[in-house]
Curated annotation (Swiss-Prot):
Protein name, as recorded: Manganese import ATP-binding protein ScaC
Gene expressing this chain: scaC
Free-text disruption phenotype from the record: Inactivation of the gene results in both impaired growth and strong inhibition of Mn(2+) uptake.
Organism of derivation: Streptococcus gordonii
PANTHER family listed in its UniProt record: IRON TRANSPORT SYSTEM ATP-BINDING PROTEIN HI_0361-RELATED (PTHR42734:SF5), METAL TRANSPORT SYSTEM ATP-BINDING PROTEIN TM_0124-RELATED (PTHR42734)
PROSITE patterns noted in UniProt: ABC_TRANSPORTER_1 (PS00211), ABC_TRANSPORTER_2 (PS50893)
């Protein structure tokens, strides 16, 4: 049985303190400071090259960085098992020979011993997760046989079996069908209801109000952070996007 609900009374919080990242001497993220309290679905919004994906990678230690991040008061790099991460699809090899159920089962490995075989109860969790995302009949297929939206749902199912307290998603809705997007958002909303804290790098401004409780507006620096209602404003968006906002048709 999948475990989703966090401990009652516990406050889940990400603290980002002076986080900076440079690539080949070029500053990509400049002293980001923000505290995100869960449960929530928070959108990370900004123009191309604003440092959105870099922020996630810096938090996870995937790229070299300055500053620090805390998870519930502890160094985030010591709490990685509590975080599920789905990177951009462009970085994933669709042709890798692995079945859907095996791909989902990878979410279980942070919690099992090296070379330990999965138990029947573990495969039950995999099947339950696939059912939640509407892919229970696809378990034996190769991932190369899936559409982009179906594969993204597989990655969400992998997050489900990981049973993490925090979920970081980098552009999960790019290039997927509307049915898959709806299923993923329904799943994420249930996870938030169950106490999870979710960060999503996102670019489609038309969906921001419908999808996010909070938004972090970013353009190499934190421009604004807060509830979507109070933060996703014309003034803040112009400050974040500048002329790009009008080139893209407005917010």
């Amino acid at each position: 049985m999948l475990r989703y609900i966090n401990t009652v009374g516990v406050i889940y919080m990400i603290e980002i303190q002076n986080l900076s990242v440079s690539y080949q001497g070029q500053l990509a993220l400049d002293k980001a400071n923000v505290t995100i309290k869960g449960p929530t679905i928070t959108g990370i919004i900004g123009p191309n090259g604003a440092g959105k994906s870099t922020l996630i990678k810096g938090l996870l230690g995937i790229v070299d960085h300055q500053g620090q991040a805390l998870l519930d008061g502890q160094p985030l790099d010591k709490e990685l098992k509590r975080i599920a991460y789905v990177e951009q699809k462009i970085n994933i090899d669709y042709n890798f020979p692995i079945k859907v159920k095996e791909c989902v089962s990878l979410g279980l490995y942070p919690k099992i011993k090296l070379f330990q075989r999965l138990k029947t109860s573990d495969w039950d969790k995999v099947n339950q997760a696939l059912k939640i995302v509407g892919l229970e009949d696809f378990a034996e297929r190769q991932i190369s046989q899936l559409s982009g939206g179906q594969f993204q749902r597989v990655l969400i199912a992998r997050c489900l079996v990981q049973e993490a307290d925090y979920i970081f998603l980098d552009e999960p809705f790019v290039g997927i069908d509307s049915v898959s997007e709806e299923i993923i958002m329904k799943t994420l909303r249930q996870l938030r209801k169950d106490g999870k804290t979710i960060l999503i790098v996102h670019h489609d401004l038309s969906k921001v109000v419908a999808y996010f409780d909070q938004v972090l507006l970013l353009n190499k620096k934190v421009v604004a952070f807060g509830s979507t209602e109070s933060t996703f404003t014309k003034e803040n968006m112009q400050q974040t996007y500048g002329s790009q906002l009008f080139m893209n048709g407005g917010a």
